[in-house]
Amino acid sequence: MLDSLKIARADLVTHDIGNMVGFAFAALHPDRVGKFVLIDAPVPGVGPWEEILKNPLLWHFRFGGPDMERLVAGRERIYLDRFWNEFSAVPAHFDEASREHYAKLYALPGAMHSGFAQFAAFDQDAIDNRALLGQKGKLKMPVLAIGGEKSFGTQMATVMSAGADNVTGAIIPGSGHWIMEENPQATVAAVRAFLVPARTKKTKS
């Protein structure tokens, strides 16, 4: 996409599964990434991954087997509500309109299959990411690791320090995992404070 848009270098801002995609891109193409913001989700194979997997809130990482899709088919909203409720500081902040919207999308043919496939790929992701770190070393670009106060919190920066040399941490107060729904103002402010100074400096020069 960057090539199509003729963009040589970009800042990355990622959340959840996006962190994993972003980490792989940043590791493989460090010259294409200026700064990297990861929001409230661990990256497989980075830091104490096996210990992270023991967190009972991450039960879905290991929710697999031949019948999982049939168990959820037609009950997508029930399954998804557990995520929105358990991972929120205040479940009401993930509003009904958003819940209905995402539940309809996940009820489409193949959607839940793809969702489960993401989690099933984590073991291979961990192997690949450890190999990348072994071959290329830690990320060198500035990294901001944001955690929701009621979610990964300070653990985000601690874990990402195992995968990057220049890590800054930030906490979004009163927020769980869904930080853009729960505290968008603080989230945008944290991201802008990290990214904008570099852009301002480039503009002045």
Go through each PLM region and give its residues.
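Catalytic histidine-centered segment of alpha/beta-hydrolase-like enzymes
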Residues: S175-P184, V188
